[in-house]
């Protein structure tokens, strides 16, 4: 996955459009997410480790919101020879096109079905692992519960959901300090104040983070009885829930 440098918001613009996973973003996404999301590489690698432990032979794996395929590739490396199928879904044609190129670059005996479509329309069945890696936060809040319910019903007993999300905090001082530390992380990775400000404006209407408590309550309501936060750096997190 050769990454071009993200300079999308480097020039001042009078009108900042809502963030979209279009061709411009797809072309720099690997660089963008590495410089914007603390711990992203660790999360991707650990998703593969979870797959090694939870994916059962002759079952299916779902990567919902697969972007360029980083999680799918991490999973596929760990489940060779299990006669499984990975269903990777993204609603951005640009992302799916580049994802297919990334998948084609590696030989594997594990089938990947790559779908350009809405994750809310995907039928989930016989699943031993479902991954939502920084995806749920982009759905309208009113649609999130139904998706979690669909995932729960499509998972086999003992199956795992990995849910990575930017989170918000009801505690104002905690929200403030962790948000500022995240901005420092982006500054340290070469983003200017202009880039940070303009991207924040672009994301304002399309990404709505939940609190960790809300995530856990939603998962519990839909039937998940085992839950843990396994990763957090500033306001970025990854959780697991077992059916």
UniProtKB/Swiss-Prot annotation:
Native source organism of the sequence: Shewanella sp. (strain ANA-3)
CDD domains recorded: AdoMet_MTases (cd02440)
Pfam family, one: Methyltransf_25
GO biological process: one example: tRNA wobble uridine modification
Binding site for S-adenosyl-L-methionine: 40, 65-67, 90-91, 118-119, 133, 200
Entry-linked Gene3D superfamilies: Vaccinia Virus protein VP39
Protein's recorded name: Carboxy-S-adenosyl-L-methionine synthase
Domain of life according to the entry: Bacteria
Known function: Catalyzes the conversion of S-adenosyl-L-methionine (SAM) to carboxy-S-adenosyl-L-methionine (Cx-SAM).
Organism placement in taxonomy: Bacteria, Pseudomonadati, Pseudomonadota, Gammaproteobacteria, Alteromonadales
Residue spans crossing the bilayer: none
Keyword Glycoprotein: no
Catalytic reactions on record: prephenate + S-adenosyl-L-methionine = carboxy-S-adenosyl-L-methionine + 3-phenylpyruvate + H2O
Family note: Belongs to the class I-like SAM-binding methyltransferase superfamily. Cx-SAM synthase family.
NCBIfam families: carboxy-S-adenosyl-L-methionine synthase CmoA, PRK15451.1
Subunit note: Homodimer.
EC number(s) per entry: 2.1.3.-
GO molecular function: carboxyl- or carbamoyltransferase activity; S-adenosyl-L-methionine binding
Top enzyme class: transferase
InterPro entries the UniProt entry points to: CmoA, Methyltransf_25, SAM-dependent_MTases_sf
UniProt keyword annotations, A-Z: S-adenosyl-L-methionine, Transferase
């Amino acid at each position: 996955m050769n990454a071009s440098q993200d300079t999308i918001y480097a020039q001042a613009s009078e009108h900042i459009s809502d963030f979209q996973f279009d061709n411009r973003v797809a072309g720099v996404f690997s660089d963008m997410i590495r410089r914007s999301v603390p711990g992203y590489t660790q999360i991707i690698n650990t998703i593969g480790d979870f797959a090694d432990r939870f994916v059962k032979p002759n079952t299916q794996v779902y990567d919902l919101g697969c972007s360029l395929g980083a999680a799918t590739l991490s999973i596929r490396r760990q489940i060779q020879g299990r006669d499984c199928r990975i269903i990777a879904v993204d609603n951005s044609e640009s992302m799916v096109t580049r994802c297919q190129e990334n998948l084609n670059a590696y030989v594997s005996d594990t089938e990947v079905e790559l779908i350009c479509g809405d994750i809310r329309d995907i039928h989930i069945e016989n699943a031993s692992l479902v991954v939502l890696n920084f995806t749920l936060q982009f759905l309208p809040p009113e649609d999130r519960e139904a998706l979690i319910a669909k995932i729960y019903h499509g998972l086999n007993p003992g199956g795992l959901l990995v849910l990575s999300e930017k989170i918000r905090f009801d505690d104002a001082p905690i929200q403030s300090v962790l948000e500022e530390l995240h901005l420092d992380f982006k500054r340290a990775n070469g983003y200017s104040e202009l880039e940070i400000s303009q991207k924040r404006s672009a994301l304002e209407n399309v990404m709505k983070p939940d609190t960790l408590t809300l995530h856990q309550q939603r998962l519990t309501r839909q039937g998940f009885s085992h839950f843990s936060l396994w990763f957090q750096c500033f306001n970025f997190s990854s959780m697991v829930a077992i059916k």
